[in-house]
UniProtKB/Swiss-Prot annotation:
The keyword Magnesium does not apply. Coiled coil: none annotated. It comes from Stevia rebaudiana. Belongs to the UDP-glycosyltransferase family. This is UDP-glycosyltransferase 79A2. It is an enzyme of class 2 (transferase). Keywords: Transferase. The gene is UGT79A2. Its EC number is 2.4.1.-. Gene3D superfamilies: Glycogen Phosphorylase B. GO terms for molecular function: UDP-glucosyltransferase activity. CDD domains: GT1_Gtf-like. May glycosylate diterpenes or flavonols in leaves.
């Protein structure tokens, strides 16, 4: 499918939340649009500290530029903290306050840029009013699966859930059972998150969801029927094939092991496990007897080497030195997942990571830690049956080493029998769908053609 030369001049502004879990899908969307429609002009709005990284993520030679934003000073927000990766859990709220104070700056920029559309994130709930005053249309881009959008489009939103049991009942009505500890986590963010999302949906001209009917058919139908605004699907926005080579240190280590034998374990850049979770996870990986590559992250202001020594079980590093790596810091995750020796992915079920796992041949073992990760995991494990979730205690989410071992064992051993056989086949079918370039391009083309017609 080639649409080059078929592009009416169109100018889009991208304004994601200052978190790379949000910035990345906006970049991927930009890259896919510019590949099919090189005449479409795209302008990114980003915090100054993130500009260079975003520029390296964008396709070269595209009609896309990044404009740095100045983040206002807020008491208590450390200087230089301009995205959630640099913020502590205590200062993320202050980062959002600083973003809210950018409204005059954003209005001035939009008045000068005069784009056709602004594609914005849920934290920027105030943007539709600003854009409307300037005669600019707005698109709310949900980087979440449709199951997270549902409470904000549901007719139940007039009576928001206020207890743990309310949350459990609401999610059950969507066909997604959640445990008590998950409902507590969801309830803690429900009011602010869905209040913002409500304002985004009701204020925008149209809503764009990073999902597809092949993965969430009935929920997408419900969202489309209940939404106050037109709903467009962009598909799961599968990342482009990775470029460059895997770091030689990691490549040499992975090359030592047979195909599909290594467990890669990571929880993203913004999830910090507790001491108990680190201990049980490490011991569970050791119990499998398989080689593993464990990535652990700690807050920016701590000594990572000291934290690894403090939190890992006594003698652990010595016991696993021949078949285990424990690392803290950034790694080339997509390169590692694509390596021939990697056969299992133990992770937090962040949506972007789910897609990265599905397009590779590594079996998914999910250990969700917060909000949308809980429901993402249920969709993959219980509905699509393309992975498994680590069993956890209902009241507090505790998991032990045996729970980790049993989850890995269920997909990595005795693969010719159930449940591993069916899980692997379902994974294969999803991978085939996600790697169908024509289907993915059609989502982008349908979206852009609809924008041209508006």
């Amino acid at each position: 499918m080639s649409l080059k030369g078929n592009d009416k001049e169109l100018h889009l502004v991208m304004f994601p939340f200052f978190a790379f879990g949000h910035i990345t899908p906006f970049v991927q969307l930009s890259n896919k649009i510019s590949s099919l429609y090189p005449g479409v002009k795209i302008t990114f709005l980003a915090a100054s500290a993130s500009v260079s990284r975003i520029e390296t993520m964008l396709n070269p030679s595209t009609n896309t530029k990044v404009i740095p934003l100045t983040l206002p000073r807020v008491d208590g927000l450390p200087e230089g903290v301009e995205n959630t990766a640099d913020a502590s859990p205590a200062t993320i709220g202050l980062l959002v306050v600083a973003i809210d104070l950018m409204q005059p700056q954003i209005k001035t920029l939009l008045a000068n840029l005069k784009p056709d559309f602004v594609i914005f994130d849920f934290v920027h709930w105030w943007l539709p009013e600003i854009a409307s005053e300037l005669g600019i249309k707005t698109i709310y881009f949900s980087v979440y699966m449709a199951n997270i959008v549902m409470p904000s489009t549901s007719k139940l939103t007039g009576n928001k859930p206020s207890t743990v049991e309310d949350i459990k009942a609401l999610q059950q009505s969507y066909g997604i059972p959640v445990k008590t500890f998950e409902a507590i986590s969801l309830m803690n963010v429900f009011k602010s998150f869905h209040d913002w999302m409500d304002k985004c949906i009701n204020g925008c001209n149209l809503m764009l969801i990073k999902s597809c009917r092949e993965m969430e058919g009935s929920r997408i139908d419900d969202v489309t029927k209940q939404s106050t605004r037109p709903v467009f699907l962009i598909g799961p926005v599968v990342p482009e094939p990775h470029s460059g080579e895997l770091d030689e240190t990691w490549a040499n280590w992975l090359n030592r092991f047979p195909a599909k034998s290594v467990i890669y374990c990571s929880f993203g850049s913004e999830t910090f496990l507790t001491d108990d979770q680190i201990r049980e996870l490490a011991l569970g990986l050791e119990l499998t007897g398989l080689p593993f590559f464990l990535v652990l992250n700690f807050p920016a202001n701590v000594d990572k080497s000291a934290e690894l020594k403090r939190t890992l079980p006594d003698g652990f590093l010595e016991r696993v030195k021949d078949k285990g790596i424990v690392h803290s810091g950034w790694v080339q995750q997509r390169h590692i997942l694509a390596h021939d020796s990697v056969g299992c992915y133990v992770f937090h079920a962040g949506y972007g990571s789910v897609i990265e796992g599905l397009v590779n041949d590594c079996q998914l073992v999910m250990l969700p830690m917060k909000v949308d990760q809980f429901t993402n995991s249920k969709v993959i494990a219980l509905e699509l049956k393309a992975g498994v979730e680590v069993n956890r205690r209902d009241e507090d989410g505790y998991f032990g080493k045996d729970d980790v071992f049993e989850a890995v064992e269920s997909v990595m051993m005795d693969t010719e029998n159930e449940p591993a056989k069916s899980i692997r086949e379902n994974h294969r079918k999803l991978k085939e769908f996600l790697q169908n370039d024509e289907i993915q391009k059609k989502y982008i083309a349908d979206f852009v053609e609809n924008l041209k017609a508006l």
